[in-house]
């Protein structure tokens, strides 16, 4: 386990982006997230924040790694990690968390199902409410086939019944965490 406490950078948000075959989506995501950070730099409560993007290529076969490398050429705030094969989203997220140096760390999908526009609101909730983490959940399944929505709801209900955990329907990996929370996850 890589411990980054000594290297933590105050007022920095690290964005961990696990990617598997996201060659087409990654440039769109990058444009959107940089737009959000540019907007945040104009607002008084977030003006001093900087960011780093940590793109974790989970063994993609479509050129995702080439796109990630290209992004690092023009933006020193972008880093990438490359896996030799597909180890799964959780392994990619964990590797990204291990390399994140920000005082705050977010996990976001590159396919824009996690709206980057929510990041300022999530940051505000983290700061004003004193939370260690702010998570998201999907409230609507518009555009998804009815049969998939049906089985997703059934899955969450069943898992809540057979486990001691309350499984929230539509819970997402998209979250913003403070350093204390991230370090606890990694320990």
Q: What residue ranges belong to the model's regions?
A:
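Conserved donor nucleotide-binding strand/loop of the catalytic core
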Residues: 50-54, 65-99, 137
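Short, Lys/Arg-enriched N-terminal segments with co-localized hydrophobic residues
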Residues: 1-7
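Short, well-formed alpha-helical segments that are part of the catalytic scaffolds
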Residues: 22-44
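Donor nucleotide-sugar binding loop of glycosyltransferases
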Residues: 22-25, 60, 115
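Cell-envelope/extracellular polymer assembly enzymes that use nucleotide-activated donors
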Residues: 12-14, 52
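Acceptor/aglycone-binding surface of glycosyltransferases and processive sugar-polymer synthases
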Residues: 83-85, 89-99, 104, 116-187
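A conserved acidic beta->alpha catalytic loop
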Residues: 54-65, 112-113
């Amino acid at each position: 386990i890589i411990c980054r406490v000594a290297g933590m950078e105050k007022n920095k948000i690290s964005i961990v982006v696990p990617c598997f075959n996201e060659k087409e989506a990654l440039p769109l995501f990058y444009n959107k997230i940089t737009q959000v950070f540019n907007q945040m730099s104009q607002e008084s409560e977030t003006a001093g924040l900087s960011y780093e993007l940590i793109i974790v290529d989970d063994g993609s076969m479509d050129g995702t790694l080439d796109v990630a490398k290209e992004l690092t050429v023009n933006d020193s705030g972008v880093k990438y990690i490359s896996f030799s094969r597909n180890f799964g989203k959780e392994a990619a997220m964990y590797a990204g968390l291990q390399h994140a140096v920000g005082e705050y760390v977010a996990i976001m999908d590159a396919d824009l199902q996690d709206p980057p526009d929510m990041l300022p609101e999530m940051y505000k909730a983290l700061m004003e409410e004193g939370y260690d983490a702010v998570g998201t959940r999907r409230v609507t399944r518009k555009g998804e086939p009815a049969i998939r929505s049906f089985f997703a709801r059934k899955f969450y209900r069943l898992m809540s019944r057979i486990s001691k955990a309350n499984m929230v329907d539509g819970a997402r990996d998209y979250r913003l965490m403070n350093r204390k929370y991230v370090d606890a996850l990694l320990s």
